[in-house]
Amino acid sequence: VYGGLSAMKALSGPFGGIKFIPTGGVNAQNVGEYISAPFIHAVGGSWLCSKADIAAHRFDRITELCRRARAAALGFELVHVGVNAPDADASMELCRMLDAAFGLGVRPGNSSNFAGSAVEVMKAPYLGASGHIAIGTNSVPRAVAELEKRGFAVDPSTAKYKGEKLTAVYLRQDFGGFAIHLVQK
């Protein structure tokens, strides 16, 4: 499709059941944007594997470019840190303290309160002895597949969906007293 993401988005309206596999116009800087679009199935392109690198047998370079592309496509980044508080009062007290110290603001919630967007304070102990670390990704299902290849497992009982799309899930492993919460950006 000529016209990049905007053209594919326009076509996905009347043809909602189709998925695209763009190979032109995709590069290391925009692969995350492409792969996070709901109407994109996969991406590719010659930027990953140049003819010169193939001819010169620079497979280490090609492997590194592919690793970087995969990292860019997944787009892992810290979203917030979750702290386990014993109860709702302690949760609000900690949020107010963080607000007083750093001017983050306080946002009350159902099962937790937030100090700004960086700190979530649970109203009751939840996963992780100390709390959780929320890691955002461009695609939770793709992140799960990648993490499983790396030897990590998800806890399916924690999965959250928007319609049929997986939008959040916790990993089973403990990371220094913290659970890892994968969330859709």
Question: Which residues are covered by each model-predicted region?
Answer:
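Glycine-rich phosphate-binding active-site loops on the catalytic face of alpha/beta enzymes
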Residues: 1-5, 39-62
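Glycine-rich beta-to-alpha transition loops that act as phosphate-gripper elements at the mouths
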Residues: 1-2, 22-28
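Alpha-helix-loop-beta-strand connector modules within alpha/beta enzyme cores
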Residues: 3-21, 63-73
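Catalytic cores of alpha/beta
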Residues: 6, 12-16, 26-42
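Hydrophobic faces of well-ordered beta-strands that scaffold small-molecule active sites
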Residues: 19-24, 41-45, 81, 133
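Vicinal oxygen chelate
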Residues: 57, 118-123, 148-185
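N-terminal beta-strand motif that seeds the catalytic metal site of vicinal oxygen chelate
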Residues: 70-95, 128-135
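Amphipathic alpha-helical segments
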Residues: 87-102, 143-150
